[in-house]
Swiss-Prot record:
This is Probable glucosamine 6-phosphate N-acetyltransferase 2. It catalyses: D-glucosamine 6-phosphate + acetyl-CoA = N-acetyl-D-glucosamine 6-phosphate + CoA + H(+). It is an enzyme of class 2 (transferase). It comes from the Eukaryota. It is found in: Endoplasmic reticulum membrane. It is a peripheral membrane protein. Substrate binds at residues 43, 93-96, 105-107, 136-137. Belongs to the acetyltransferase family. GNA1 subfamily. GO terms for cellular component: endoplasmic reticulum membrane. Homodimer. Transmembrane segments: none annotated. Its EC number is 2.3.1.4.
Amino acid sequence: MASTSPEPSTAAAVAETGCSVQIRRLEATDHEKGFVALLSQLSACPDLTASEFAACFADLAALGDDHVILVAEDPAAPESRILATGCLFVERKFLRGGGKVGHVEDVVVDAAARGRGLGLRVVRRLVEIAKEAGCYKVILDCTPELRAYYAKCGFVEKGVQMAIYF
């Protein structure tokens, strides 16, 4: 999870949104800031010990810019917690001359922080990163209830998702 340019500076973010929430890459210390608990608001997510989190973080960090996890955090808050997150996985293809596709996954905003535009900011930044990485498209799967939300993020409905779970 190598560094890319972060979202606009805190001052710019405050001017744009009226809050000091920053969008940045996941850090190894985010376990203590409730990252795993936030993911459990999206889907079943067993609690990880600090060492399990560190091992998973190291594995994902080794993928570099092909696997980017962003988080939203308000460093001005008395108790800094992760308020939102989203992930971008970049897939290399033989199609389109070895093109790349960005997959947006695991987007969730803490229930207490919803309605503040944090998910939109995370998703838009993930799309920017995909574009910077040379992806020819960005795709995601969502429930029917979230179609309108992702349409606000610029996505259009295409196709049908099918899955096999193990």
